[in-house]
Amino acid sequence: MMNAETALLLSRQSTDDSFREYHCSAGLIFLAFAVEAMFIFYRRQVDSDYDKRGDKACRKDFHKKTLELYGIKNYLGRRDYQIVKTCLDARDSIAHGDFFISNFEFTPTVADDHNIFSGEILTQSSEQFRNITLRMLEEGINAAKRIDEYIYDNGYKVDENIDSEFMPKLQLAFGVSGMYTW
């Protein structure tokens, strides 16, 4: 999540459109990684035997099952999840090499130099990158943090024979520094 937030700050500071677009795209990719890691982190808190490599479930089913394991039902339709899903889908369109046809206006600046034409055309963003905006990244980061907090506030290990109010709290995914005190 820290990389996504850094990319957000860099894109806000950028005065050049291509740098802003680059940082937004990089931030969105890191956001998607963070969200996937968050769900795996929570899954392992309630299912210590969970093996990511052996899990062939699609993302939607994995997220739904993981949420159900800590007592949260019908969350995938909520606004925050839908915002994050949009970010995940955008990342997938980049990462999986989805085919896009991009149209844009092009007026040659020099009459005879084909090399310059090529450079100008190749610097145009393809469709999947044009759809990534600063707002999309910012909303995605905020939505992911709210999902993390919601799971932390409302989630518990369902299979224990203890009332939910007395269940031990799950650890925040985005609040973990990577260090653990023994």
What do these predicted ranges mean?
Residues Q13, E36, R43-R44, E149, ...:
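A generic secondary-structure boundary signal that marks alpha-helix termini
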